[in-house]
């Protein structure tokens, strides 16, 4: 089965809001094994939307739209769909009653714009919207399906999960299973080289690598005549990939690197304190995203100036004078200093040059040192990163979390 997504709204077309609906729907359809080959964004224009329907139904079995179901004149998705299929818009009494009750309960009058939300192309399957006044609907015509959904994600997502997914599952002829492996610490080329023979000879399951801002992912997908069959095909492929990539794989599916690190620290009862310079609080911010981290995260401090490194971390001024603030030696003293002052098992430090100015030949922009002091034993890692100032800071944060993860696991603490 092939599906196409049409997102409706001039605000989307002009880039005024981000189109998260299409991303969500595409992922959900993929989980059902429904192929999505095309997506489009159409402004609030009846002619262009009708043309989009014409094109979409020539190549797709299911067309899903979001937006254009509101009470205003430029909300014309249902009107365009009715015209496209040669159908009339007719009242749906249950929806009209709910709309009237909604406004009456708030002491408001129902106008014609509100009432039109209770009208649908004749023969439609109406899907109630418990989170808004715009019900969705499904139109079935000539073995094709048009699904009209509201635009606000807080309305669209619950409606899709509870009503659209069960509807689409009735047409499944295969079952699908997916596993996403999250990778950090190696480049895309290095990862691809390590698993190239697997990728080249894939049939079922398939393996697809993706680059993301904070790392890489590998998506394993399998199909079968039953869900159990599809699930069982994933495991051998996953084991093969894990054997190749080892500790470079830090987690699965939607789990974040900071969540993995937090869980390791909590499980091993390792307290941590952090001293940041170039990352300016990014590192502490990422770690406190995880609920429960307060049981092990004792202290975080941004020591941006040389004076603050000396004052709060006890870094020797002569070390800074001799080696510079961005150096292995200063990163070491920062990590040991925060560990000592906070009385924690782990002291973590980051110092570097994020740019855009200040670099030189022996210390270029993107040079970062990470200090990790664990129970009195300190290691320092050098990173050479590229990109904008914020990109370097973000990458430094990610790599620091990953280096901490590896150090703790390698030491078998």
UniProtKB/Swiss-Prot annotation:
CDD domains documented for this protein: cinA
InterPro entries: CinA (IPR050101), CinA-like_C (IPR036653), CinA_C (IPR008136), CinA_KH (IPR041424), Competence-induced_CinA (IPR008135), MoaB/Mog-like_dom_sf (IPR036425), MoaB/Mog_dom (IPR001453)
Domain of life: Bacteria
Family classification: Belongs to the CinA family.
Stated name of the protein: Putative competence-damage inducible protein
Gene: cinA
């Amino acid at each position: 089965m092939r599906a196409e997504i049409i997102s409706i709204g001039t605000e989307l077309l002009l880039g005024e809001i981000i189109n998260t609906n299409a991303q969500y729907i595409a992922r959900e359809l993929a989980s059902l094994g429904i192929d999505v080959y095309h997506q489009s964004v159409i402004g609030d224009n009846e002619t262009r939307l009708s043309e989009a329907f014409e094109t979409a139904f020539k190549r797709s079995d299911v067309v899903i739209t979001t937006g254009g179901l509101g009470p205003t004149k430029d909300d014309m998705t249902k009107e365009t769909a009715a015209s496209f299929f040669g159908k009339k818009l007719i009242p749906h009494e249950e929806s009209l009653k709910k709309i009237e009750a909604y406004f009456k309960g708030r002491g408001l009058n129902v106008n014609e714009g509100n009432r039109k939300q209770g009208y649908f192309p004749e023969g439609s399957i109406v899907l109630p919207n418990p989170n808004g006044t715009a019900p969705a609907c499904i139109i079935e015509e000539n073995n094709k399906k048009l699904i009209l959904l509201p635009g606000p994600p807080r309305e669209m997502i619950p409606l899709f999960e509870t009503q659209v997914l069960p509807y689409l599952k009735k047409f499944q002829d295969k079952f699908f299973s997916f596993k996403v492996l999250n990778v950090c610490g190696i480049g895309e080329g290095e990862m691809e080289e390590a698993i190239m023979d697997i990728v080249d000879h894939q049939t079922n399951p398939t393996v697809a690598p993706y680059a993301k801002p904070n790392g890489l992912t590998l998506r394993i997908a399998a199909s079968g005549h039953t869900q159990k069959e599809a699930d069982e095909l994933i495991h051998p492929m996953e084991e093969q990939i894990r054997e190749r990539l080892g500790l470079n794989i830090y987690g699965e599916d939607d789990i974040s690197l900071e969540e993995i690190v937090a869980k390791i620290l909590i499980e091993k009862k390792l307290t941590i304190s952090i001293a940041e310079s170039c990352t300016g609080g990014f590192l502490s911010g990422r770690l406190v995203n995880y609920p429960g981290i307060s049981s092990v995260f004792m202290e975080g401090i941004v020591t941006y100036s040389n004076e603050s490194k000396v004052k709060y971390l006890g870094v020797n001024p002569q070390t800074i004078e001799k080696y510079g603030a961005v150096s292995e030696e200063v990163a070491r003293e920062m990590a040991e200093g925060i560990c000592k002052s906070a009385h924690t098992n782990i002291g973590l430090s980051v110092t570097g040059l994020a740019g855009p100015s200040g670099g030189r030949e022996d210390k270029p922009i993107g040079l970062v040192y990470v200090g990790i002091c664990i129970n009195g034993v300190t290691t320092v890692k050098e990173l050479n990163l590229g990109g904008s100032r914020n990109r370097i800071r973000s990458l430094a944060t990610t790599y620091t979390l990953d280096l901490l993860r590896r150090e703790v696991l390698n030491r078998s603490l």
